[in-house]
Amino acid sequence: MKTVKFKLISALLLLIIAFSLTNCIISKDDKKEYDQLKARCELESQNKSTVRQVFEAINARDFEKMRTFYAPEYKMTGPRLPNAYTLDSLIQYIQRDIAVFPDWKYSVENMVAQGDTVAVKIAQFGVQANDYMGIKPKANQISRAAIFITVFSNGKLKETWILQDNLGFME
C-alpha cells in the first residue's frame, strides 16, 4: 500500500514538474522581444543618467566634464533662439548667466525617456549680482522654468530643443 501511494505521489510530482517546465519555456520570438525591450530600457535609463550628469557638471561649473557628454555636431534650437547653439556657444551662454547670477543652479524636476529621446523639465534659479540686459541687480532669487527635449546618438547628446519661460524670468 505504501509503495502504491509513493508511486502515485511520485508520478503526480513528475507531472507537476513537467507541466511547470513546459510553461516556463519562452519562445525565440518572445525572448527576442524581451531582449529588445530590456536593451531599450537600459538605453533610456543611461540617457536619463547622462542628462542628470550634464546638469550636475553645469552646477559644479565643470565645463570640461560637460563637454564629454556631447557629440561633436551638437546643436540646440528653440522657438526663441534665432540661431542654433553649438556646444561652444551653449557653454558661453551658460557662463554669461553665471557671471550675472553666480549661484545659478539647475534642478531636474521631471524626466521621461523614449528610445533615443529624453524630455526633461528643469527649474533654474539664482540671485542676480550684476546688470542683466539693463536690469539692475535685486536681492531676491530669480527663477526660470524650462523644458529640454534631447536626442542622443551613440550615447552622446546630439541635439536639444528648448523652451524657457523667459517672460516670467524678466518679471
Task: List each language-model region with its residue ranges.
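Bacterial Sec-dependent N-terminal signal peptides
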Residues: M1-Y34
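Short, low-complexity N-terminal intrinsically disordered segments enriched in polar/charged residues
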Residues: C24-P72
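Low-complexity, intrinsically disordered terminal/linker segments enriched in charged
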Residues: D30-E33, K158-E171
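Hydrophobic pocket/interface hotspot
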Residues: V51-V54, K65-R67, Y74, L90, ...
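Carbohydrate-interacting regions of secretory-pathway proteins
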Residues: E56, T68, A113, G168-M170
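A solvent-exposed, acidic/Ser-Thr-rich amphipathic alpha-helical stretch
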Residues: F63-G115
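Short beta-strand segments enriched in hydrophobic/aromatic residues
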Residues: Y70, V112, Q124-G126, L163-Q164
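Exposed beta-sheet edge and beta->alpha loop/turn motif
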Residues: A123-L157
